[in-house]
Amino acid sequence: VKVVATGGTGQLGRVLARELRAEGHEVVIVGRSAGGDVVPWDGRTLGPWARHVDGADVVVNLAGRSVNCRYHKHHLAEMMFSRVDSTRVVGEAIAAAAKPPRVWLQMSTATIYAHRLDAPNDEGTGVLGGFEPEAPGYWRSSVDIATQWERTLREAPTPNTRKIAIRSSFAMSPDR
């Protein structure tokens, strides 16, 4: 299986690539930290990196500015644009592919859900958050980012590719 991992130079991308390669899969890492076996991209525009999407079985987009920071306007804008722009351009690459991937796994976030103790949140019954009376303002910002991120995924014109938003929470790794 050929997997293209955009934004694949971060914590999750390194672990994913290592595990997939150990299973015998071909992995193409696309990232801003070019060098070695990393195909360079800027996360905003189509470029030579997009040719790797054509003929891939799976694309995994892990790109996005780290949330490990203070949530001031500048960082929130970086979080938003790094996620929305990279998702948009991955969609453009898939749409332009003569042989598009069967699956597009798109990182998202579980912070899209409301804080609740009465029931679990999932895709079928989950309650979107950000409007809880006791919620700090930055929660709303996180939900706005997640909502626009997933909207960009949904609206990508990729009819021959199954799109999956991965609503994960914090991921820890022995690599860091």
Indicate residue ranges for each PLM-predicted region.
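N-terminal Rossmann NAD(P)H-binding glycine-rich loop of SDR-like oxidoreductase domains
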Residues: V3-E23
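SDR active-site strand-loop-helix element
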Residues: T6, V30, V59-A63, W104-A110, ...
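Rossmann-fold NAD(P)-dependent oxidoreductase module
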Residues: V15, E19, A93, T152
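Conserved glycine-rich Rossmann-like NAD(P)H-binding loop of the short-chain dehydrogenase/reductase
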Residues: H25-S33
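NAD(P)H-binding glycine-rich loop region in Rossmannoid oxidoreductase-like domains
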Residues: G35-V89
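Conserved Rossmann-fold NAD(P)-dependent oxidoreductase catalytic core, especially the SDR/UDP-sugar
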Residues: R88-W139, I164
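Flexible, glycine-rich beta-alpha linker
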Residues: I112-A114, T161-R176
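Active-site Tyr-X1-5-Lys
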Residues: E132-A165
